[in-house]
Structure formats: structure tokens, C-alpha cells
Amino acid sequence: MNTSENRFIVWVDDLDDNAISIAGSKVARLGELRKMGIKVPDGFVVSTDAFYMFMKSNDLEKQISQKVQLITDANDLDQVETISEEIRHLIEISEIPDDLCDAIKNSYQELSFKCSDINLPTAVRSSATGEDSADSSFAGQFDTYLGVTGRQRLVESVRKCWASLFTSRALSYRLKNNLSHENSPMAVGILQLVHARVSGVAFSIHPVTGSKDRMVIEGNWGWGEAVVQGVVTPDHIEVGKTDMRLLEHQIADKQIVSAFDYAEGMVIERKMPKLFREAPILTEEEITTICKTVKAIEDKYNYPVDVEWVVDKNRREGDPVTIVQTRPETVHSNEENESASNKWDPVAYATKYAFKG
């Protein structure tokens, strides 16, 4: 690997929590989890150095700064959206320098060979340096692309992730919270796409009541896109944190599944066969495995967490589940002044927080 690739590409195996400035919090934490012995996807990160190099080579910093200064009211949605579209267009038409482009393509080829799949499906996930911190929840404000195959599509998806740093939601959020645009670089994770039988999110505390002795799991067949889009309600599970005893298990009518279409090379929505619509997505053994993993992550960081998990379609009893993201739990802390009796709405949660970039 040449010098430029060393600057632009870092493998998950070489990351930990000290690499957030290089890899963003999302992918850096995956490296830390792997060092804990927790199963995470294979992959690499296109570093913040690569982002800065792309911005500088296209003289984007000054142009973006000038456009951001035109926003006079962060609450004016039309104004923010107009500027956002202009900035994202600037980024999406800008050329990625050849050496950076080659580094991304070569690393994808190396990952494909490592995973024994010459046209490996990947998850291209934004990983901003200020994302998912305990005091500023960026969850769901940046883009993720599932099922990306081929070197050229991968490069294009990386550029789209960079552009998502300037969505209207992200722009407005930074302006309202006095966060710098110039000091918020975007890294991008390129991760092997797990062949999901089911996927979901798990909390180490109850996200509505704040109860520290209850863990909550939400999930659906396949990937989480159908939940994000609000077309399916996930199963809801509550477990005692101390004894891992199943306390509540609500099985939803899951009519839609997000599945990978190998012919199209993308994740698509399909109708779920009637046999599986009202079937539980997880066995008790899988529920316990997820909860023990989440508890280990909470113990590591010493604060409540929410975790995105995937059960591989080839998983056998006793195997680990795959963790694709972890972050500080912010739902309850952001809503702690609201009534704890509010009814938990899994679709509203997922649309706002889970399964997103």
C-alpha cells in the first residue's frame, strides 16, 4: 500500500476509539468493538484526510462557507433546503482526485478478495467526527447506502456520503447548536454487507421511561429500511438487564421485508410471505445473545448505549450476532422532560434515529 493510500484508507482492524478524528465515531467504534472480541463487519474507512483532500482539490471550502453565510435563519426550512441543495450539487459534480479514487477502488478489490466475493455487496456508511457524541445527537442526519457493488458505484456513493454532510437537517442542526461546518469532516466506512435474516436496534436502557433495569430490542426481517420508511412496525422486546429474563414480546404484523436483490445489486422492498408476517423474528437464544452483547458495550463505555445489530442468515445457535453501529443512547436523555408515560412508538423512533447513516 502506497503512502497516499495509508493517508486515505484505514482498515477496521487498525481502528479504535482514539481514531475518531480520522475515521469518525461510527467506524472508529467498530474497530474498538472488534478489539473487545465483538463481531463487526470487515471493511475500511475513507479517512477525513481524504475528505479534506477532496475539498481542497476542488476549492470547495470557500464556496461552501460563502453559501452557508447566506442562511439568515436556521429555522427557515425553505432557505436552508435551497442552500443545502446548492452545496450538495457542488460536491456531487466535483471530481475525486485520481490517487484518492485509485486508493478507494484498490481497497474495495482487496476487501472483495478477503471476503471471497469479487463483486462484494457493501454498506457505504457516513461517519462524521462530531456524529453520535453524547451531547449532540446527529443520528439519522447523514446518508448510508446498502448493497453497493462495483468499484465505480462505490466511489460515487462515497461522494454522496460526503455531500450528506450538508443536508438541510445537518446544516440546520449545526447552525442551531453553534457547531462549525469547517471543523466537521466526514469519513466514510466501506463495510461488507451482512446477509441479514433479521436486523434491528437494541437499547441498554428503556428509551422512553429511562429504566436502567430493562433492555429493549426492536427488529424486522431483513434490513431496517422498511422500518425507516414507516411501512412496517417492528417486533418489540423487553428484557431484564440483570437476569436476562424475557419481560415483554410484542410480535408485529411485518408485511414488508427489505432484501438484497443480487440481479439489481441493491436493497429492495418485498412483500413478506404470510407464514412469516406474524412470526417472531428472534429466538430466545438470539435475544439473550443480543442483550449480553449490548450489556458488554454499555459496561465498556460506562454509559447507556443504543446498538444496531444484524443476525446473519447463516448464523447458528451459539454464534455471535454482528454489530454494525453503537452510539450513546440519546432518545431518553433528549426527552427526559417529557412524560414518561408517553407510549413507545417504534416507527417514530426508527424514522428519527435508527438504521440511518
Question: In which residue ranges do the predicted regions lie?
Answer:
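Cytochrome P450 core scaffold surrounding the K-helix E-X-X-R motif
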Residues: 225-229, 332-338
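Short beta->alpha transition motifs characteristic of CBS
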Residues: 219, 324-332
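Segments forming glycine/polar-rich beta-alpha architectures that bind adenosine-containing cofactors
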Residues: 199, 205-206
